[in-house]
A protein has these predicted regions:
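Pre-recognition alpha-helix immediately N-terminal to the DNA-recognition helix
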Residues: 18-20
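C-terminal regulatory/oligomerization modules of transcriptional regulators
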Residues: 1-4, 23-37, 42, 54, ...
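Short, hydrophobic-biased segments on the C-terminal half of alpha helices
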Residues: 49-50
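Short helix-coil-helix linker/hinge
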Residues: 11-16
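Short, Lys/Arg-rich nucleic-acid/phosphate-binding segment
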Residues: 62-68
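Interfacial catalytic loop of ABC nucleotide-binding domains
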Residues: 7
């Protein structure tokens, strides 16, 4: 799983590939269609698609003469699970810190109240 995640995150490190993934989330597209808005060759886009494909983020199919690129949703479930695990750990750390700070604030208030009463 970690090796697969490494490939996914490495593939998404490139802004052009992230943009392609965002576009594919809206609809399937051919390599030529994906290349249209960019100032790069179709061959360069093909190489980017290959990286995304190797990471399991996309797959190509054949529909008559078209070879549309599809986004693979299951990889996003894998990434979400990984992120969620660490998000929960961080939230727990912040909760403990909040509890500690609240306890110190109560302690300071108690000390101030005792000092004022003297």
């Amino acid at each position: 799983v970690e090796d697969r995640l490494s490939k996914v995150f490495a593939a998404l490190a490139d802004p052009l590939r992230r943009d392609m993934v965002a576009r594919l989330a809206a609809d399937d597209a051919t390599v030529n269609e994906l290349a249209e808005p960019y100032d790069v060759s179709v061959q360069a886009v093909s190489k980017h698609i290959k990286v995304l494909e190797d990471a399991g983020l996309v797959r190509r199919s054949r529909q008559a003469q078209r070879r549309p690129v599809h986004l693979e949703a299951e990889v996003f479930d894998l990434m979400t699970a990984w992120i969620e695990r660490y998000r929960r750990q961080v939230e727990e750390r912040y909760r403990r810190l909040d509890d500690l700070l609240a306890g110190e604030a109560r302690s300071d208030t108690d000390t101030d109240t005792e000092g004022a009463a003297s």
